A protein has these predicted regions:
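Outer-pore turret/helix-boundary of cation channels
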Residues: 129-176
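Pore-domain transmembrane helices of cation channels
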Residues: 103-142
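Short, hydrophobic transmembrane alpha-helix segments
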Residues: 37-49, 68-71
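Canonical alpha-helical transmembrane segments
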Residues: 58-72
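Cytoplasmic-side transmembrane-helix entry/capping segments in multi-pass membrane proteins
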Residues: 74-86
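Structural signature of hydrophobic alpha-helical transmembrane segments
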Residues: 25, 46-59
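Pore domain of cation channels
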Residues: 170-206
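N-terminal membrane topogenic signal
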Residues: 14-28
Length: 206
């Protein structure tokens, strides 16, 4: 009587090719960030309407290239997305500098306006870094859908204990948004651990 060899455990969804991720959560977050930029006072921005208009144009361009599900890697689409996130991040850094300059220089006299501006800059920063994490983890959403890269840049709890998640679980934009939120509030990793140098440096920059 021969021993039967048990079938090997199937690869978890985050390590194999999948149908990809809908991009609408990331797109909605981008629209919220752009709206936050538009409520900032003009003295905190270089061009109050120009930068949001450029960002909206790049977002529309990106959606025209792929309007729904990111199920494969596209170099052209990724370049547009990275450029958009870069513009968003630089514009928000400029606004943060303007806010600090007004506070230190004693030019800020309206407390309510300061609170609204600070909240808008903080939310935009959180969304911008969530997008960086989403675009860079294992090569971006397109590469993740192809299941090419074996090792994650961010270690989520579901990866360490697959019994805590459905078999088809894989990280989506909301997971990266929560990662960015906890990093911005706790100033340290919480449930998600950075595994690579770029991930650690990006969290440090945030």
């Amino acid at each position: 009587m021969t021993d039967t060899v048990p079938d090997p455990e199937p690869e978890p969804a985050w390590r194999r090719a999948t149908a990809g991720e809908s991009r609408w959560a990331a797109s909605i977050a981008l629209l919220i960030a752009i709206a936050c930029q538009m409520v900032l006072p003009v003295e905190f921005t270089t061009h109050r309407w120009l930068v949001p208009a450029i960002e909206l144009g790049m977002l529309v361009w990106s959606l025209l290239m792929n309007p729904n599900r990111i199920d494969r890697h596209s170099g052209a689409l990724r370049r547009v997305n990275l450029a958009l996130i870069g513009v968003l991040t630089l514009a928000n850094a400029r606004a943060a500098w303007g806010l600090v300059d007004h506070i230190v220089g004693g030019q800020a006299t309206n407390a309510g306006r300061l609170l609204v501006s600070g909240a808008a800059i903080w939310v935009t920063n959180m969304i911008a870094f969530a997008l960086w994490y989403w675009e860079f983890d294992r090569g971006g959403p397109g590469r993740r859908s192809e299941g090419i890269r074996e090792y994650p840049d961010f270690l989520f709890p579901q990866m360490q204990n697959p019994d805590l998640a459905p078999k088809d679980w894989e990280p989506s934009f909301v997971d990266y948004l929560y990662l960015s939120f906890t990093n911005a509030t706790a100033f340290s990793p919480t449930d998600v651990l950075p595994m690579t140098q770029w991930a650690k440096l990006t969290m440090l920059a945030q």
